Amino acid sequence: MTNISISEEIATACPDLHVLALSCDVCNSEPDERLWQEIADEEKAVRETVKLEQINKWLPIQATRQAYKRLGKDPNRYRPSSEALRRRILRELPLYKVDTLVDLINLVSIRSGYSIGGFDADKISGGSLVLGVDRKSVV
């Protein structure tokens, strides 16, 4: 089992942060049409119930944006993934088809409003993962 921890910077800036970690064995595949039908249904529901100017007012997204600000990140430049996905939907831009696991994580993110990370435990070196803030400048 991988040991997951939160950096001191995040723990200090976001004392109410809750993290859920699930571990499971899965078999990934190319994009699945049944899953993409479910994603299409969710896209339709988002278009029917959400306005572009309301996205960042939704509590899960609003909380993530506040956390970004506390950590020195501009949430208008570095949008939470759940917000970015909903914005793509409302702009009628297609969502990227990556693979079944990534597409499923994106669907859960769209529905829940929470940004979700998926990691391959076999690729985590040293058996531990620290959730932190990237301080590298992006060009």
Please provide the spans of the model-predicted regions.
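N- or domain-start disorder-to-order transition segments that initiate the globular core
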Residues: 2-3, 40
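Gly/serine-rich nucleotide phosphate-binding loop at the start of the catalytic core
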Residues: 8-42
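Short, structured patches in soluble enzyme cores that scaffold and shape functional sites
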Residues: 23-26, 106, 112, 133-135
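Glycine/proline-rich, flexible active-site/cofactor-binding loop segments
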Residues: 32-84, 90
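Short, conserved phosphate-binding/catalytic loop or strand-edge motifs used
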Residues: 81-86, 125-129
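Conserved phosphate/anionic-ligand binding catalytic regions in large, soluble enzymes, centered on
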Residues: 94-119
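Regulatory modules associated with amino-acid/nitrogen control
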Residues: 116-134
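Conserved small/polar residues in nucleotide/adenosyl-binding loops
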Residues: 138
